[in-house]
């Protein structure tokens, strides 16, 4: 399985011969990195089999970068509105949307879904979902790999909860160190000093992980 970071909080996931772009096209927002022109071209030259978005904030979904797919590609585009309940199968990979609550309390009515992708491995892509809501979700399959924002690793209580879910974490939604005005990197590094048997990756933009 390959995971390439293509956006602030998004990745291109390749598993079992299927490629799925998850929140993988974004605009510049504050200190967070946008999808670069080179990555946008790479994705258009080799389009993924599907695109999925957890919500439509600009740091997770770029309307401008999404437009060429809607104009030129016949592949289905999946997002919160088109996947409210059911599971979709693409090749040997199933994608199950799970209704989830966005971090914080500023937008209580914001539509947000997370995705469970199952093939030879089970991957959770949670978007900006608040972490504590997963604590007692015994109805969901446990992930082999969790792809999550920095908020899943900036407090010990949350990090311990993550450790009860999975042993492999890919952390996204972190700004570059040089523009990190809120100390997010310091909080994450302090929290994750003792990783136990947890494997943690924090990929750079464009970096490809083989897991």
Show the residue positions of the predicted features:
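Pre-active-site segment of Zn-dependent metallo-hydrolases
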Residues: 12-52, 63-65, 105, 130-141
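Active-site-proximal loop/helix segments of hydrolase catalytic cores
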Residues: 104-164
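Zn-dependent metallo-beta-lactamase
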Residues: 1-21, 26-29, 35-38, 98, ...
């Amino acid at each position: 399985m390959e995971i390439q970071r293509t956006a602030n909080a998004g990745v291109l996931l390749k598993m079992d011969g299927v490629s799925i772009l998850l929140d993988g096209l974004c605009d510049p927002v504050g200190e967070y990195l946008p999808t670069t022109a080179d990555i946008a071209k790479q994705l258009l030259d080799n389009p993924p089999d599907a695109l999925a978005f957890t919500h439509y904030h600009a740091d997770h979904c770029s309307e401008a970068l999404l437009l060429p797919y809607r104009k030129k590609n016949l592949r289905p585009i999946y997002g919160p509105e088109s996947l409210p309940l059911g599971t979709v199968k693409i090749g040997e990979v199933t994608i199950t949307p799970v209704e989830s609550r966005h971090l914080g309390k500023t937008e209580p009515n914001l539509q947000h879904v997370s995705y469970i992708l199952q093939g030879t491995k089970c991957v959770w892509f949670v978007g900006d979902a608040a972490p504590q809501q997963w604590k007692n979700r015994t109805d969901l399959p446990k992930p082999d790999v969790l792809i999550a924002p920095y908020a899943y690793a900036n407090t010990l209580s949350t990090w311990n909860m993550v450790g009860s879910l999975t042993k492999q974490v890919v952390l996204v939604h972190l700004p570059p160190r040089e523009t990190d005005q809120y100390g997010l990197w310091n909080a994450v590094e302090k929290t994750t000093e003792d990783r136990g048997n947890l494997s943690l990756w924090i990929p750079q933009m464009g970096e490809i992980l083989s897991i």
